[in-house]
Amino acid sequence: MFDYSIFAKEIDELKNQGLYTYIRTLESPQGAWLVIDGKKVLNLCSNNYLGFANEERLKNAAKQAVEKWGVGPGAVRTIAGTFSLHNELEETLAKFKKVEATIFLQSGFVANQAVIPAITNEEDAILSDELNHASIIDGVRLSKAKRFVWKHRDIKDLEEKLKEAKDARRKLIITDGVFSMDGDLAPLPEIVELAEKYNAMVMVDDAHGEGVLGSHGRGIVDHFGLHGRVDIEIGTLSKAFGVLGGYIAGKKELIDYLKQKARPFLFSSPLSPADTAAALEATKILQESDERVKRLWDNAKYFKEEMKKLGFDTGESETPITPVMLYDAKLSTQFSKELFEEGIFAQSIGYPTVPKGKARIRVMISAVHTKEDLDFALEKFEKVGKKLGVI
């Protein structure tokens, strides 16, 4: 019989290093406040940027979809699993993103695994930022293309890598739009200029830019005014949109090709009618108003400014993501536990999610937080920070 003690030993080692992830169980819907282990806590670590995860309009849309379409698609989309509701979501997303077409997948993670190996082979070169998301890294691993990893946000290094890849049939530059652990932005205008100079494609994963950046939350491409110059946009429906799923946006020819070649599209069932309808409703709300997006930024600006006044190191974030840098993994884990005891739910992030020696509490501000919520958080961060000698 297999000896499972090897896994137990590895788990013990993770605990000793302060790298073991303790998974909390929610006993309430997503929102500014949660109930965990019977305790009411302020939620500072979800990706529910705009509060859509428990929004009445989305819930009603999901209920109506279940009544009309049932609970599941019943097949993959290429056989008998494409409802007109699915097509409506893709068409609405395309209009919202100002692209020709979109295709949605089961998650943003899956979207990266779908597109990268589908459009590259051993004759091609992929150039990837060193801090790109795990889903991009795994997508690149599924491709047979030659790989070049360029230094984080370093345009000069990217150009050197493009020169090294000059003999490739096709060159694909991939970057996160917003880097999820630090909150910094990709230098997308400079990347696009290099891509045009070296005849390369540009792909941006905008998981943390959707609903956050640009007019009405259209994302980083809109933020920089680069419509028509970025070949592939990857989006998620599980963060600011508050639901589930991911999508690929771009030229109609690309999307048609992916419907024939992308393995997750071909061999796995699509989103349920409820998820599809809720995501569609979220898109409609964003099209109607950017009030929530503005409120999100106002909240984030206030919280960051006050945290800096208290003496916390909040990194170089350019977005509502606020990393509270503690560096030591054990300290970060203890800080998170102390915050929870004070009524704050803010998880510690350590290796391998971030490099060793870069542990932090990643604070995620949302549009549904009130000033009173944020002041409560600031009070508790100050208390724990002083207790643990951080400030």
Curated annotation (Swiss-Prot):
Pfam families cross-referenced by the UniProt entry: Aminotran_1_2 (PF00155)
Keyword Transmembrane helix: no
Cofactor list: pyridoxal 5'-phosphate
InterPro entries xrefs: Aminotrans_II_pyridoxalP_BS, Aminotransferase_I/II_large, AON_synthase_class-II, AONS_Archaea/Firmicutes, AONS_Archaea/Proteobacteria, PyrdxlP-dep_Trfase, PyrdxlP-dep_Trfase_major, PyrdxlP-dep_Trfase_small
Binding residue positions for pyridoxal 5'-phosphate: 108-109, 180, 208, 236
PROSITE patterns, sorted: AA_TRANSFER_CLASS_2
Gene3D superfamilies: Aspartate Aminotransferase, domain 1, Type I PLP-dependent aspartate aminotransferase-like (Major domain)
Modified residues annotated as N6-(pyridoxal phosphate)lysine in this record: 239
EC nos: 2.3.1.47
One Gene Ontology term of the molecular function aspect: 8-amino-7-oxononanoate synthase activity
Recorded family membership: Belongs to the class-II pyridoxal-phosphate-dependent aminotransferase family. BioF subfamily.
Pathway(s) where this gene product acts: Cofactor biosynthesis; biotin biosynthesis
Record organism: Thermosipho melanesiensis (strain DSM 12029 / CIP 104789 / BI429)
Protein name: 8-amino-7-oxononanoate synthase
Functional note: Catalyzes the decarboxylative condensation of pimeloyl-[acyl-carrier protein] and L-alanine to produce 8-amino-7-oxononanoate (AON), [acyl-carrier protein], and carbon dioxide.
